[in-house]
Amino acid sequence: MNDDIMRKPPARRLGQQAFVLRHSPDGQDELHVLLVDPVYRDGYTLPGGSAEADELPHLAARRHLETETGLALPLRTILTVDYMARHQYPEGINFVYAGGVVTPRQAKAVNLHRPPPNIRALHWIPRHLLDTVMPSNQALRVHDAWDAWEHGAGRPLLLRGTPVPVR
């Protein structure tokens, strides 16, 4: 499905991504963000993809997160919005949703999850390494989402003026 969207994308992509953290498995208090290594581009990115026609944006983010990582998390808080002018891909707007900090059990399940063929691998990356594993625009997006998450600056997605329910 993602390959079709990349070959015949809509006029303006509406990207939906999830920002999910875990605590360092070595017992330190350092947080790591969940990233995917897609086959269709260089560098890692947040889990996510385009919303289908008439698909609610937060549910598109959840669908991509679950398909790519096995996690089914409620996603309703937007941490950042990133406009991308047409370049290698069509013009798009990317919404990043807060997935929160997963439990050790959830993190282990992600590590055991077999991603779909369009994802090479899943990685938990500490913040200080983001710039080494992601294209600069992607790393800037994740840094901005991380800052918003740390400061509680997210905003709920509204559907006709009403915050979406947590599901």
Question: Where on the chain are the PLM-derived regions?
Answer:
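Unchanged
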Residues: 51-74, 82-138
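Residue-level recognition of beta-strand microenvironments
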Residues: 23, 78-83
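Nudix hydrolase/Nudix homology domain
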Residues: 42-44, 114-167
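Acidic, metal-coordinating catalytic segment for phosphate/diphosphate chemistry
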Residues: 1-17, 23-25
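Short, solvent-exposed loop/turn segments that connect beta-strands within catalytic domains
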Residues: 23-31, 88-90
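Short, acidic/hydrophobic/Gly-rich beta-strand patch recurrent on exposed beta strands
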Residues: 35-37
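Conserved beta-strand and immediately adjacent loop positions that scaffold enzyme active sites
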Residues: 17, 32, 121
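Thr-Gly-centered strand-to-loop micro-motif
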Residues: 46-48
